[in-house]
Curated annotation (Swiss-Prot):
The keyword DNA damage applies. Residues 209-244 form the UVR domain. Its main location: cytoplasm. This is UvrABC system protein C. It comes from Gloeobacter violaceus (strain ATCC 29082 / PCC 7421). It comes from the Bacteria. Transmembrane segments: none annotated. Residues 20-99 form the GIY-YIG domain. Keywords: Cytoplasm, DNA damage, DNA excision, DNA repair, Excision nuclease, SOS response. HAMAP family: UvrC.
Length: 628
């Protein structure tokens, strides 16, 4: 059965049955996948508008309409109920066409990995790529200020510093310096550590005043109990938080105000949106968004931006007042929805009063400045692509570029990376890691040529099963003639010899082409060379980080892993009980046997492993293996 737009009779029949009540509509493709979820106070008018001939849809929505095979309706009593239901459905199904804002990686987020036993806090440019329990704050417009703030928080609060421990049996120097609570050796319980993370989350939510009051109470309690060392740490933390607040610009005289202000600037191709967060009279956050220009009314754009932003916000992060540059078409519905989420009344309006109007004007000026920056960046990216196509005599502009790099230490833990740039910008959803499988490549016997050949073979061997658009317009090999020759031999063997391929040597930034002995020289400062350097450096970073991760896993492998009968669960029990392998090694048989879940037989195996003669160890291991 064809899609609705190609089946006029079925489309007419479906549209005639539409009700005029409020509700939610779900657009589905031929496979039944939800493409888009929307709300409407009049479902008949809203859904019909998608299929009216000559309707000026944005390119994104026009593509979506062409894929609609059918739609589903859910009726509600009120428009506010429709907004709440739409929010829940979007969170559940994550339809691809409900994303208005561009995922351009321009602005960073701060992520807290609540899904982990000991949560991490880090800066990322990919929102929502992890576990649903993880929390994201942002996107922030000033990456430098964000990194500085995170650095200060790490000084004030002892936090997890690494993904993998440095040592198996003792904490690293960060613990000795008071920067980490020693969670790698479980010197702090998950409950205690998560309480610290909750305090940091309060800061990110703009609840610093509330946190300071809590810390003051804790300091007084510690001092009364004569725990002066703990009281001093709390005092230093309070001082640091006050210093952090001193750098925040006071924007309004009302010290209790909690409000967001949003404005936009647009040209023919792009919309730049800025949202300022004011809490307790201080500007605590400048968030930036961008979207492709669609010709929509500015009020409609702001409405959709706010809905998308607050959909991902916790109740504590919703302000009591939202100031908008333009009136919103459904401000009352949005205010009702936000009030239900927050549990308090939320006001939304385009201000006329001097102080509030000046705040919105300041946000609008920042949106205009950011739009100009984005335009300059876009022009430079396009110039780099055009210059590169000319310098390399490519058949077309390299919209999709792939770069490959190898990383190892003398053949140990050899890995490779693939990074992808689309229109001159990183497209991290296409990044890949590779573990080199060639058995000939081992410690002391590295072979970058064979490693590169393997990676290119694995990538293009599966190219036939991928959409045609996933083939690169240009392949960049991080290396000289040897690596390039190895890659080209494989590509030609797999019938992909027509894909343009170059090698980029690090030392002199020389560009090598297949079949040419002399390199192509691209002038320093040329946007084309800058583009090649960026993708090469990104591939190197991605490969090195993966190699470091693999090496860390190998180095931190516990000696307990060599004892039969001890899996992850029992290893955790033993380390929870004895804190480290050296302490367990010194324990008596009786102490080990008392450990819950271990038992006397396994305790004998463990004790013999650490203390017995080789023959005794072998007999104990054989007995345990036979018992299992």
């Amino acid at each position: 059965m064809p899609n609705l737009i190609a089946d006029p009779e079925r489309l007419k029949e479906r549209l005639e049955l539409l009700p005029t009540s409020a509700g939610v509509y779900l657009m589905r493709d031929e496979a039944g996948e939800i493409l888009y979820v929307g709300k409407a106070k009049n479902l008949r008018n809203r859904v019909r508008s998608y299929f009216q001939p000559g309707h000026d849809h944005s390119p994104r929505i026009a593509i979506m309409v062409g894929k609609v095979h059918d739609f589903e309706l859910i009726l509600t009593d009120t428009e506010a109920e429709a907004l709440v239901l739409e929010d829940n459905l979007i969170k559940t199904h994550k339809p691809r066409y409900n994303v208005l804002l561009k995922d351009d990686k321009q602005y960073p987020y701060l992520c807290i990995t609540w899904s982990e036993e000991y949560p991490r806090i880090f800066v990322t440019r990919r929102r929502g790529s992890g576990h649903p329990e993880d929390r994201y704050f942002g996107p922030y417009t000033d990456a430098g200020a964000l990194h500085s703030t995170l650095g200060l928080l790490k000084k004030l609060f002892p936090l997890r510093q690494r993904n993998t421990p440095v040592f198996k049996d003792r904490p690293c120097i960060n613990y000795e310096m008071g920067r980490c609570p020693g969670l790698c050796q479980r010197l702090i319980s998950p409950q205690e550590y998560r309480a610290t993370i909750r305090q940091i989350q309060m800061i990110l939510q703009g609840r610093t005043a509330e946190l300071l009051a809590q810390l003051e109470d804790q300091m007084q309690t510690a001092a009364a109990a004569m725990n002066f060392e703990h009281a001093a740490r709390l005092r230093d933390r309070i001082t640091g938080l006050n210093q952090l607040g001193a750098h925040q610009k006071i924007t309004v005289p009302d010290s209790s105000v909690s409000r967001d202000a949003v404005a936009l600037a647009a040209d023919a191709a792009l919309v730049s949106i800025q949202l300022f967060q004011v809490r307790s009279g201080k500007l605590i956050g400048r968030l930036g968004f961008s979207a492709a220009a669609s010709g929509e009314d500015p009020g409609h754009i702001l409405q959709r931006v706010l809905e998308e932003h607050y959909r991902a916000s916790a109740s504590e992060e919703i302000p009591l007042e939202v100031l908008t540059q333009h009136p919103l078409p459904e401000a009352d519905i949005l205010a009702t929805w936000l009030a239900e989420k927050k549990g308090r009344k939320v006001e939304i309006h385009a201000p006329q009063r001097q102080i509030k109007a000046e705040l919105v004007e300041m946000v609008a000026r920042n949106a205009e400045a950011e739009l100009q920056r984005l335009e300059r960046f876009s022009r430079r990216q396009e110039k780099g692509l055009l210059n590169l196509a000319e310098a390399l005599e490519l058949p077309s502009v390299p919209r999709r570029m792939e770069c490959y790099d190898i990383s190892h230490i003398q053949g140990t833990d050899t890995v490779a990376s693939r990074v992808v740039f689309v229109d001159g910008a990183p497209a991290k959803q296409y990044y890949r890691h590779y573990k080199i499988r060639d058995p000939r490549i081992v410690a002391g016997r590295p072979d970058d040529f064979a490693s590169m050949a393997e990676v290119i073979s694995r990538r293009f061997a599966r190219a036939e099963s991928e959409p045609e658009g996933d083939l690169p317009d240009l392949v960049v090999i991080d290396g000289g003639k040897g690596q390039l020759s190895a890659a080209r031999a494989v590509m030609e063997e797999l019938s992909y010899g027509d894909v343009p391929t170059i090698g980029l040597a690090k030392r002199l930034e020389e560009v090598f082409l297949p079949g040419r002995s002399d390199p192509v020289l691209i002038a320093q400062g040329d946007p084309a060379l800058h583009l090649l350097q960026r993708i090469r450096d990104e591939a190197h970073r991605f490969a090195v980080s993966f190699h470091r991760e693999q090496r860390g896993k190998r180095m931190t492998r516990s000696s307990l892993d060599d004892i039969p009968g001890i899996g992850p669960a029992k290893r955790k029990i033993l380390l929870d009980t004895f804190r480290s392998v050296p302490v367990l090694e010194k324990a008596s048989f009786e102490e080990i046997a008392k450990t819950p879940g271990i038992g006397s037989r396994l305790a004998q195996v463990i004790h013999t492993y650490f203390h017995g003669e080789p023959e005794a160890v072998a007999r104990a291991l054989e007995a345990e293996q036979a018992a299992n």
